[in-house]
Amino acid sequence: MLTVLLAMAGPLPPILPDIGAERPPWVFEADDEALLESAQFGAFRALTSVTAYGGMVRDATNSPVISMAGVGFQLAALALAPEHGWLTEAEAETQALNILQEILNTPNIAKHGLYYHWIDAITGAPRPDWDGVSTVDSALFYAGAIVAGSRFGGLVDDAVVDLLLAADWSKFVLTDEVSGFPSGYLSLAWEPDNEAQPIGAGTLMPFAWVDAMDEERLTVFLAQTQPDTAKSTDPNLWWSLRRPMGNTPAGERVVYSPYSGAYFRTFYAQLFMDTPRMGPDNPSERGFPARTTTDFWENSRRHAQMHRDRAINNPNGLPTLGETGWPLTASLSPSGYAVPGVFPITQPIPGAQRPEDEPNPGGTSPDDGDGTVAVYGAAGALMFDQRAMEVLRYARNLNAPLVWNEPSVGGFGYRDAWNEGDGGWSASQHLSIDDGALLVAIENARTGRVWSLFHDHPFVQLAMDHIGLTRSSCAWGGCPEDVDRNCVIEFSDLLAVLSDWGFNPGSPADVNQDNAVEFSDLLAVLSAIGPCQAGELPE
């Protein structure tokens, strides 16, 4: 086991957390708990009050369309409602079932079992004039549905299983080379040739999910929940997603997206996938040596640090940015929808081929936008960095109703985004994918419940097995004495210490991290014999 762990580094420096690093769920002060509960209730109200066709949430407060990704978050919110006292068990289950049955019974909104990004808020008809059948929005919808199915079981889960079994992901795999990438990657979307025939003949968009960021990983992962391999994708697609490398200004190595530095790109998959307990993966073992071993929770923590540092340094002197105004991510802004972001300093990958292994150079300059900060971004960062709580406290205390509308008197809590320049601005619209991300991220930071519900579903367990991913009951690396990382400190850990005895920098058996495996490490393991309970999720 120890040899395997050391080999995980491969030819590239791995992205691993410090041994013993704390992972969520976190313990919050009572005042912060109260604020987070209120914020979640506000987001829940937005997701269940601004409804349209079939009881589904509108994409935005006054939007003419429904986003299927937003519906996924609505279903996840309903799964959480009984524990919070927002709805009774029967009310939440009934609402979830009604939405799922409406989707199953609505014609023309799915092609090969995947869903149009947008459907009409009044009629439920697909809106190909807005966008096509979206793989990532379908993935977000399925993820939220899985959470609801896992939580309620029964007829709700029967409907979820019907949806998952109908999805033919193989029809969204590009069969030709696109932009220098070989065939086999998932397309972003399918579009009809004739908008009047939304599920007639059509073509896949010649753009693929190719990088191992959160939209890509969640989409590729959900494709593996299909038990019929003829309707799934190659499990190696997970490992083939390229991992561009960069260094943050603080000198930390990260995998990054060459197309967008917006923070949402680093956490949307982890709203559902329990990376704190999944630990690092190892593409080199799967035949992809130009993809580094990555603990994606740690990767997102480093991105959060990079965004925070950028906001504090604020080289352009923009309003809002600072210790209480970060990260930079996609949101509404005073000038419309904006996608600011932060990039690391690009680092070459030895032996990499372009563009299959790493992007062509250039095009990754930081974009601070106009300083607008989206509250859901801070909530997402809270899953990785507890200092994001400073942003949530500050935004709550801004002159109401600039950013906060009190849920206890009918408000929806945080507004989508705010900017303190020119007398102050905040978004008048609520976005379902932002409110949903905020609610789910805070739940994971507080309890990890969404992670548990998602991974409890047998179709998710199937996907984990298909790809070759594992999940522990404790936080990966949470107990330094657990040398072989199996959540139990036992005789095998003692043997691992003895086998690595001596000067051995970087060895997992170097419990006290002094670059030598010695008697003090052996004593530490002996003293800790028993289960590792660090980061265990509540039942």
Question: Which sequence ranges carry the predicted segments?
Answer:
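Bacterial N-terminal signal peptides
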Residues: 1-7
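Cellulosome-associated attachment modules in secreted, modular CAZymes
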Residues: 9, 474-539
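Ser/Thr/Asn(+Pro)-rich, low-complexity disordered segments
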Residues: 10-476
